[in-house]
Amino acid sequence: MYQPQPFVTRLAFKCSDRPEAQEARERLAARYGDVGPENAQVIVALGGDGFMLESLHEAIASQTPIYGMNRGSVGFLMNEYSEDGLLERINAAERAVIHPLAMVAIDARRTQHRALAINEVSLLRQTRQTAKLRISIDGKVRMGELVCDGALLATPAGSTAYNLSAHGPIIPIDGRVLALTPISAFRPRRWRGALLPQSARVTFEILEADKRPVSAVADNFEVRDAMEVHISEDRGTSLAMLFDAGRSLEERVLAEQFSA
């Protein structure tokens, strides 16, 4: 999971639209230089977890490692903010490599929509009526009918986000599993979800779709009126996040399981 990296000297700074993030970017760029994302060895993201997610999506093509510092409200994926010794911190950082989920959603017009999700792919009811979903794993029907507000498939990195709020399990970052979690399940009432191997191919079929429309969301990419949703891990895409020594993502995931 953790790999050594070459000595880093070229940084690109990105920031959210929060004033404190923009002010931090100006100071850090003046102090350490700013080469632009295309020439950077590491991208420094200044904001919260939402901005980190956005930055990871933008780095999919280049796969440039990202070191985040918290200048937002939620900073689970971010390092503590400090302007001192930034190059030393980055060069001593631990690297967590993650793989996104690849979603193919087919809507009511039979149009295919493709997107990648770093945290989760979620299916959500669009109206007051519950959704009805059929779930297949590797071509075999495992749940004939799930009556619910929705369901999601989360990566280890995303297991502490929406998945945790939906009472799904927290997965160690190097866990070779995905979390399949129902959202407010009505039937079967006692079903709490499942842990699937990372190689699993998951298919959701939306039942009674005309009466009970469902949207499919890959992080922030939404497909309305979904009919079928196919999800698998994209092992060909690797994204790297850098964390201060002793504060790795693995340690944060472990600590989260003992938080009040």
Curated annotation (Swiss-Prot):
The keyword Methyltransferase does not apply. It catalyses: NAD(+) + ATP = ADP + NADP(+) + H(+). GO terms for cellular component: cytoplasm. Pfam families: NAD_kinase, NAD_kinase_C. Disulfide bonds: none annotated. It is an enzyme of class 2 (transferase). Its EC number is 2.7.1.23. NAD(+) binds at D49, G50, N119, E120, D149, A157, T160, A161, Y162, N163, L164, S165. It comes from the Bacteria. It is found in: Cytoplasm. InterPro entries: ATP-NAD_kinase_N, ATP-NAD_kinase_PpnK-typ_C, NAD/diacylglycerol_kinase_sf, NADK. The active site is at D49. One of its GO terms (molecular function) is NAD+ kinase activity. Keywords: ATP-binding, Cytoplasm, Kinase, NAD, NADP, Nucleotide-binding, Transferase. Its cofactor is a divalent metal cation. One of its GO terms (biological process) is NADP biosynthetic process. Involved in the regulation of the intracellular balance of NAD and NADP, and is a key enzyme in the biosynthesis of NADP. Catalyzes specifically the phosphorylation on 2'-hydroxyl of the adenosine moiety of NAD to yield NADP. Belongs to the NAD kinase family. This is NAD kinase.
